[in-house]
From Swiss-Prot:
UniProt-listed Pfam families: F-box (PF00646), FBD (PF08387), LRR_At5g56370 (PF24758)
UniProt source species: Arabidopsis thaliana (Mouse-ear cress)
SMART domains documented for this protein: FBD, FBOX
Keyword tags: Leucine-rich repeat, Repeat
Domain F-box: residue ranges: 10-66
Domain FBD: 336-385
Listed name of the protein: Putative F-box/FBD/LRR-repeat protein At1g16940
UniProt keyword annotation of Nucleotide-binding present: no
Keyword Disulfide bond: no
Transmembrane region(s): none
LRR repeat residue intervals: 72-99, 114-141, 164-189, 204-231, 252-277, 306-331
PANTHER family: F-BOX/RNI SUPERFAMILY PROTEIN-RELATED, PROTEIN WITH RNI-LIKE_FBD-LIKE DOMAIN
InterPro entries: F-box-like_dom_sf, F-box_AtFBL13-like, F-box_dom, FBD, FBL13/AtMIF1-like, LRR_dom_sf, LRR_FXL15/At3g58940/PEG3-like
């Protein structure tokens, strides 16, 4: 590129209005944006009007180079990632955090990429008292100070806490309970014995590590609509009010201890359910000796990673779901000898949408025949495949789209996880990617 071409390009950018320049700068690393003040005199102060910043901070470097934080005028969104710590780093971290917090920001995302305990980010006490406008808070590998008697987070709606160190377990309970606008809470584990909130709509436990919750989970959340428990070994769960919960996600939950019947009671209140095949197995086992609750409200059911033998358990579970309209199944393996003679009432009379996720076409031939032949009101059957290997798979899919259906309104769709491995034929439709 010639000097003249560079000059023309520079002039074009320089003619853009400040508002558009801010949009461009907002998508660049913050340090690079600050450097633009050296390129053009007019840009010297534009970056100070940006509503957000995204910084990766190495604690071994000089913190003085970040003194530009004080010059932002309209700061609303801040993301800080610490990748290393140096001498006197903890004090400097608190100073930077205080500089950010005094801007009365609305969105704060702070974390450390370091795994050592002593490399956690130190959050200053001002997080409790000087964030009156804060709406979103995400902390990862951070140390939270002891909460004061008075905590002021009146606008906080979304809070995500991962690998946090509280001084006292009661601090977590207090932090949640004193946020009058809190709607969504996500944590990697229970940092206290209770979640109490009059405004909470969604609660997720996302821990990917196995282990027992040593304390019971107590939920005092009268407006809760969505509950997700992921890979938790739960000894006891107590929910004081079940009437508000609409969606329940128990994917990857393998053991409930003494609470299975309580969980089944919870399931009986929800309309949208995601469960692991372990729960299906337990339900089948207990159904032989106990009278278990029915799930008349359940409209949407998703079961992931179904293993050999879980089909029979699913059929028994479906017998208790007389009004089910949508069923999603993911198979990690398949048993050609499973029983297809039993047909639950919901398959016959209420099921409208079926989605099957599998590795190969051949595994699913009997399964799609089962739903096509028995479902009278089926509107859509979706088959999601990892791949299609050869011509035999194409022929088998052709049979799927021409297979007789008991419901004349049924649409058939095939989705492929990998692109370019399957070309749709004229007789049917195909959607790529899922």
């Amino acid at each position: 590129m010639t000097f003249e071409e560079k000059r023309v390009g520079h002039n074009i950018i320089n003619q853009l209005p400040d508002s558009l320049l801010c949009e461009i700068f907002f998508n660049l690393p913050t340090e690079e944006v600050v450097k633009t003040s050296l390129i053009c005199r007019r840009w010297r102060y534009v970056w100070q009007s940006l509503p957000g910043l995204d910084l990766v901070i190495n604690g071994s470097k000089n913190y003085d180079k970040f003194d530009f934080l004080e010059r932002f005028m309209f700061l609303q969104r801040v993301k800080l990632r610490y990748v290393g710590y140096g001498h006197n780093c903890r004090n400097m971290t608190s100073m930077m955090m205080n500089n950010v917090i005094k801007h009365k920001i609305q969105h704060l995302d702070v974390g450390s990429n370091r795994r050592y305990v002593y490399d956690r980010v130190e959050i200053p006490p001002t997080i409790y008292t000087s964030c009156e406008r804060l709406v979103f808070l995400k902390l990862h590998r951070a140390n939270l100070p002891k909460s004061p008697d008075s905590v002021s987070l009146p606008c906080l709606k979304i809070m995500d806490l991962q690998k946090i160190n509280f001084v006292d377990s009661l601090d977590m309970e207090k932090l949640v309970s004193v946020c009058p606008a809190l709607e969504t809470l996500t944590m990697d584990k229970m940092y206290g014995a209770k979640v109490s909130s009059q405004s909470l709509l969604s609660f997720c436990l996302t821990n990917n590590e196995t282990g027992y919750l040593k304390t019971q989970v107590v939920m005092q959340t009268p407006k809760l609509k969505y509950l997700k428990l992921n890979r938790q070994f739960i000894q006891r769960i107590v929910i004081n009010d079940l009437s508000s919960i609409v969606m329940l996600n128990l994917d990857d939950v393998a053991y409930f201890g003494e609470t299975l019947l309580s969980i089944l009671k919870l399931i009986s209140c929800v309309r949208d359910l995601t469960i692991s095949f372990d729960i299906l197995q337990d339900y089948r086992h207990f159904s032989k000796s106990k009278s278990l609750p029915k799930f008349h409200k359940l409209s949407v059911l998703s079961v992931k990673d179904m293993a050999v033998g879980s089909w029979e358990s699913l059929l028994i579970f479906l017998e208790s779901c007389q009004n089910l309209k949508s069923l999603v199944m993911g198979f990690r393996d398949y048993n050609w000898g499973i029983n297809f003679s039993d047909v639950p009432q919901c398959v016959l009379s209420s099921l409208e949408f079926v989605e099957v996720k599998a590795r190969e076409v051949a595994d699913m031939k009997k399964l799609w025949s089962y739903f096509m032949e028995n479902s009278t009101v089926l509107k859509k059957f979706t088959l999601c495949l990892d791949h299609i290997e050869d011509q035999r798979d194409h022929v088998m899919l052709s049979k799927l789209f021409t297979f007789p259906r008991r419901s004349n309104k049924c649409e058939v769709v095939v989705r492929l996880r990998t692109f370019g491995t399957y070309k749709p034929m004229s007789m049917f439709s195909c959607a790529d990617g899922f």
